[in-house]
Amino acid sequence: MVDISIIREWVAKADEDFEFALVNLKEGKPFVALICFHFHQSAEKCLKAYIVAHDLGFIKSHDLPALLKICAAKDPSLIQLSPDCEYLNTFYIETRYPVHWPTHFTVDEAERARSSAQSVKLVIEKNLNLA
């Protein structure tokens, strides 16, 4: 059995990313790309908490669909999170590094990222009996 404190630590870090993004979004901060990135990070850490909790073979990856696939091997119902993970996955590379194509994220996209991250967070935390 995995030490529950490790799982709680992953979830706490996910909560920090979510709350940081949420506060900045609500305050109308102009850093939309970073807000979207932190919503991605929240979902990533939730998925990793699930992987650790069920000893599913931790991998160093930021690819949400790949992490979700590992989680869904344990609980196929988690596949319902695929659209959210696919959407959030677009915010990892493009928000962190210079790219050679135009990138501009809107507040509406950040709101959708919030909704997707919240869906992942709620489903995973409920599944872990932490909600």
State where each predicted segment sits.
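Terminal alpha-helical segments
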Residues: 1-131
